[in-house]
Amino acid sequence: MGFWENNKDSITSGLKSAGKYGYQGTKYVAKTGYKASKKHYNNSKARRERKSGKKNSSDEEYDSEDEMEYERKPTDIRSLKDPKSFPPPPLKPGQKTYTGQQQQQMPNGQASYAFQGAYQGQPGAGSMEQSQYAQPQYNQYPQQQLQQGVMPQQQQLQQGVVPQQPPIYGEQVPPYGSNSNATSYQSLPQQNQPQNAIPSQVSLNSASQQSTGFVSQNLQYGTQSSNPAPSPSFQNGLQCHQQPQYVSHGSTNLGQSQFPSGQQQQPTTQFGQQVLPSPAQPQQQQQGQPLPPPRGQVILPAPGEPLSNGFGQQQQQQQQQQQPLNQNNALLPQMNVEGVSGMAAVQPVYGQAMSSTTNMQDSNPSYGASPMQGQPPVGGQPPVPVRMQPQPPQPMQQGNIYPIEPSLDSTGSTPHFEVTPFDPDAPAPKPKIDIPTVDVSSLPPPPTHRDRGAVVHQEPAPSGKIQPNTTSSAASLPAKHSRTTTADNERNSGNKENDESTSKSSILGHYDVDVNIMPPPKPFRHGLDSVPSEHTRKNAPERAVPILPPRNNVEPPPPPSRGNFERTESVLSTNAANVQEDPISNFLPPPKPFRHTETKQNQNSKASPVEMKGEVLPGHPSEEDRNVEPSLVPQSKPQSQSQFRRAHMETQPIQNFQPPPKPFRRSQSSNSSDSSYTIDGPEANHGRGRGRIAKHHDGDEYNPKSENSTENGRLGDAPNSFIRKRAPTPPAPSRSEKLHEGTITSEVDSSKDANKYEKSIPPVTSSIQAQQSTKKAPPPVVKPKPRNFSLKANEYPKELTREATGQDEVLNSITNELSHIKLRKTNVNLEKLGGSKKVKDSSPVPSDLDEKYVSASGSITPPRPPPSRSSPKKVPPVVPKNNDNLKKKPPVVPKKKPLLKSLEPRPIEMERAYSGDISAADDNLNPFERYKRNVVPQEDDRLHKLK
């Protein structure tokens, strides 16, 4: 403690000071960090805003501020210091070296295009050329040219340089980074000087030569051999004589020959053409513009011109090499002397020639040569630099210069070039994108499926695949069309088109198998021979029609449409041919054979009415014919179907025809089942075994014709809103009579006659049938069935016992079986137990045990008449009834079980006394005893105990 007491103050003060300064430091750090982060965020946000759309990478957002400032420079290029002070920009893949600094700013503000020897690979040559361009000598020479108009004088004034070397101007472009370019630069200034003098003299005359010289200029750019500069664009006037100097660089022969003649003016125009968008256009411009453009304007060279310059560079280089090096040397010092003053005017021309970005290197040498020609006029003659000077195109020129010569030709050009290197990166991915797209189109789709892959191998091109698919679908179509011609050409054609589209879209490979199969319509058609077949065809466009022909294969053609008689006939013929419709025939026949299998007689009768309705009715009302037809129907169902179809075709109230077969079949099946016992073979055969006739047992009395007529009447009435319901039996005989008489010629007539006969002829047969049907009904209605469950089922009242006790015997047997059943967990037979309540109910014999056990059983029936005893007093106790109503009524069965256990009925009092024992023992045996009245009070007691 002493230590703390002694040092307490110092420790506390130290902690305080440490905390204070620590807090201050942390606060300062936090503030500075916050400020820095905020500043950084703002800067990055500004960067992102500026770079939006240009750069997507997040790293660029965090570029150093130096880069930001550097990127900002392009906007302030003109305000920056002389680019000569800066090192040359990085070389592009096509460039070799940057050595010369030829940029010179014109007083007009135009960025002088420094013709850098770096493009040519010789900084010295480039600088000389720059000086030459800027030299007042060039300016003086064009002035002299303008004044004197003598080309040789101008050449002499220009340092006596032979103008033959002007091809150097074009040469400069190819040697953009080579030493040969340097030589070309040297030769170019020589040529440019005489050319400058020449254009000044012949500038007015150059208009005519520009057309000729324009081609030559193209040759100069492309071949470097033509003397006349093809670009007369600078023929705007004598003012552009310095620009003709630019032209001289374009033409290799612009040298001496051009200088003495008007061709010299053409070289001037040629140089302008380089600056202009196209050599032909510059000629026109020069011709159309006799006056020199202001310096502020810059003439842009055609993108194709620098290319031409590049092509002609080699020729120009050769010519330049031919030119005396002394002249080149003389020109170079002159250029150096006046390069600064003259470059401004001349450089814009180069910038214009440089404007074509496509061939940057080619245009650069051309520009270098042209400034050699044009720079001297800039100092001496501002009108000539006017063309050279046009500044609005200069930014484009600068942009062109950078791709051509990243060196600082003009103050504003270098920063653009430094920034532009990213542009070449953008074009690089573009070809990559183009290449995969072309490959994808040329490549076949990948095989994703086995069948698909095989098809793909067969057909590499996707278009080829599609065509084979179409061919395969077309191949399937012709077969389908043949089917449709047999059935319905129109419907099938529509369906085929749908199938084609589906097959094409879904299936990629070639498939010969027809996938569009509609089995369901077949059964529908069977159900309704004609109309449903049509519906099924509609549902299944292609397969529905083929389904009908198989019926035709049997015999009758599938009716594609009720109204198409000719088609049905053709289908019949095709069906006879048995084409394509076998599977459908397999589906169609079964319903009729089923009818025959049920009752051949009934089916024959059915076939006869159907035939009667179709075509057989008018022609075959006889029974024999009917009998023959049913035999045919099971064998060849198409006949009946064809008859149906023909009948539908002839008499199109098909609705009457279609519905009857189904209700008729049902009625036959039900009647046959009811009257199967009484139907006789001869009756069934002759009368076709109508169920009702068999029921009447009057089939012998009735003629088979009448029986058939009754059936036909039923069929006719059923479709006609069930007219038979009034008297289902009588109408049938009336129709049968008419049909057998042959009075009915059509189904409609038969139905009408049948209705008349039904009203007029309710014969005794119909009443007898109704009586028989009523007599047959009571046996199933036997009321004593519930008593059959009792043990004493044999004691049924004799009234209930009938003559034909087949059903009663069955019920009695069931009850007997129930009486022999043993109860679960008791192994006691109901027969042994005579004391059950149900036994008492069923048996007239009373039993004391039952009476005593009534309360326990829970189902008390006071109306019971047991023999008089003391037990009945116990039976009606009200309390057990209340208890039974509340709890005992549902568990009637479990009450029986305890009696079965003891086999001795306990009186109600005994049950109450032994309720505890019963509940304990019964819980194991019968779970329902829990719900007895005895169990409930126990639960109440438990609740009281809990309280």
Swiss-Prot record:
List Phosphoserine occurrences by residue: 57-58, 64, 476
| Low complexity composition bias: residue spans | 93-105, 130-163, 256-289, 313-332, 667-676
**Gene Ontology, cellular component aspect:** actin cortical patch; membrane raft
Q: How does it sit in the membrane?
A: Peripheral membrane protein
List of residues that carry Phosphothreonine? 729, 861
Name the source organism. Answer: Saccharomyces cerevisiae (strain JAY291)
Subunit organization: Interacts with RVS167.
Region of interest called Disordered, as start-end residue ranges on this chain: 1-332, 354-810, 824-904
Record flagged with keyword Phosphoprotein = yes
Q: What is this protein called?
A: Altered inheritance of mitochondria protein 3
Chief localization class?
membrane
Subcellular localization, as worded in the UniProt entry: Membrane raft
Identify the keywords attached in UniProt to this record, alphabetized: Membrane, Phosphoprotein
Q: Where is the composition biased (Basic and acidic residues)?
A: 70-84, 488-502, 526-541, 749-759
